[in-house]
């Protein structure tokens, strides 16, 4: 099978596509076929060597796919289930303690591979109405926007939200805020991206 590796000392020129053996499966792990991955700024920082990683680390923190095989102790998933990643696979519930916040794609191998072995708790179900490609964008950018608007911002209908830039988090924030009945103002230096934001229901634009 194939996977992308970041070889020391990092840099885009040190991203290598390698043929490797299929991963072995621990009792509490599943074998997952990757159908889609998404790129976040975190992944660029890892690739450039700005976030320290082990040599030959497999990058990408977000991915979606289906279960090919399950370990003997796995109870949450069955073969054929459609699943996607979570940002912090070791943080299942309770307070977000530092020791639980290991991140896929830098502390542990990520989703830039055809097949991976991963703990069953590191995945969640893909909503039935989403494709693999759509689901792969949710874990980092989508949940960051949700936490900012809902958990921290307590956004209400008819309030105004300023979205700075047109990256993944901003585009999610725009759509979530519109769904909640808020007015959205956006800033961007890209006419092309602003045209896309208009299609998504942007209220007011600043360039």
Predicted features along the sequence, with ranges:
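Alpha-helix/helix-capping structural signal
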Residues: 37-39, 72, 121, 143
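Conserved hydrophobic/aromatic beta-strand scaffold that supports enzyme active sites
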Residues: 17-22, 64-66, 115-117, 123, ...
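Glycine-rich beta-strand-centered segment in the early N-terminal region that forms part
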Residues: 21-37, 47-92, 110, 127-129
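Short N-terminal binding/cap micro-motifs at the start of the first secondary-structure element
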Residues: 11-15, 41-43
